[in-house]
Amino acid sequence: MPPKAAEKKPSTGGKAPAGKAPAEKKEAGKKTAAAASGDKKKRGKTRKETYSSYIYKVLKQVHPDTGISTRAMSILNSFVNDIFERVATEASKLAAYNKKSTISSREIQTSVRLILPGELAKHAVSEGTKAVTKYSSSAK
């Protein structure tokens, strides 16, 4: 499941790419209306994708009366991103070793077994298998 966006990104509003725009003729002595009045364009807020909403939902399932600080949420988000990157990198290497261009659930499962220690790997594999089975049955 991809991370959910924390903020909305402003749309580009139908602007053509820089190379495709029609040539505009300007007179040397004139400025545009915005430049003449000294107004600057406001930049839209950049979109930040996090796992915060998903972490919060899991927290409420496990401990409905417990909250979480922004700093703790940030740490957990970094943790999830780190584990995701490690698993994806290892799965990519496994696919390359086997001369495959697609990462399947098998590569993910093997990379989880290689990265996580002992009992934690077993639980992760069983939860992952359960999630894939649930997804496969609902997709039909």
Swiss-Prot record:
The modification N6-acetyllysine is found at residues 8-9, 15, 25. One of its GO terms (cellular component) is nucleus. Keywords: Acetylation, Chromosome, DNA-binding, Isopeptide bond, Nucleosome core, Nucleus, Ubl conjugation. Residues 1-10 have a biased composition (Basic and acidic residues). It holds the Pfam family Histone. One of its GO terms (molecular function) is protein heterodimerization activity. InterPro entries: Histone-fold, Histone_H2A/H2B/H3, Histone_H2B, HISTONE_H2B_site. This is Histone H2B. It comes from Aspergillus clavatus (strain ATCC 1007 / CBS 513.65 / DSM 816 / NCTC 3887 / NRRL 1 / QM 1276 / 107).
